[in-house]
Amino acid sequence: MTQQTVLDKIRSLVLPVLEEKGRELVDVEYRREGQGWILRLYIDQPGGVTLDACAEVSREVGVLLEVEDPIDTAYNLEVSSPGLDRPLTKLEDYERFAGRLAKVKSRVSIDVDGKGRGRKTFVGVLAGLSEGKVVLELKDKNGFRMEIPFEDIEKANLEIEF
């Protein structure tokens, strides 16, 4: 089973448990760390995630995963809030966090200054969506507005502003 297949299976198992309690699955990671494997769930809920909420989800999901057994190898389950630098994984996230500073990594190089020097990583203020494209006001280009097709985004997360 590929890692993507494992992640998809975990998402399909976990989503109903979270949605039943009004919680959101922000992201899922399954990776080798140190001597073993970690299955990490990032969750959110209105008003923020508490330690009690993480513990409750860990218990409920832990029992579910014991029964369903979607992963062949031994692993540790961790449940966490997404943090201040939360990943942006859904199209709605870019609308929800409009006005916030974000770092966006594109799958393809984009030439923003017309000099033929494309780049893939951009930091700017999220300005919402336009026809399925993420609108970003670049911090290093005096607010230059650019659009990146959602499907071209490899990774994105909120940035902590100081």
Curated annotation (Swiss-Prot):
PANTHER family: RIBOSOME MATURATION FACTOR RIMP
GO cellular component term of the entry, any: cytosol
Gene3D superfamilies reported in the protein's UniProt record: Ribosome maturation factor RimP, C-terminal domain (2.30.30.180), RimP-like superfamily, N-terminal (3.30.300.70)
Name the record gives this protein: Ribosome maturation factor RimP
SUPFAM superfamilies per UniProt: YhbC-like, C-terminal domain, YhbC-like, N-terminal domain
HAMAP family for this protein: RimP
InterPro entries: Ribosome_maturation_RimP (IPR003728), RimP_C (IPR028998), RimP_C_sf (IPR036847), RimP_N (IPR028989), RimP_N_sf (IPR035956)
Similarity section: Belongs to the RimP family.
Functional summary from the UniProt entry: Required for maturation of 30S ribosomal subunits.
Record's subcellular location: Cytoplasm
Domain of life: Bacteria
GO biological process, one term: translation
Protein source organism: Syntrophotalea carbinolica (strain DSM 2380 / NBRC 103641 / GraBd1) (Pelobacter carbinolicus)
Any single Pfam family the record assigns to this protein: RimP_N
Main location: cytoplasm
Keyword terms, alphabetized: Cytoplasm, Ribosome biogenesis
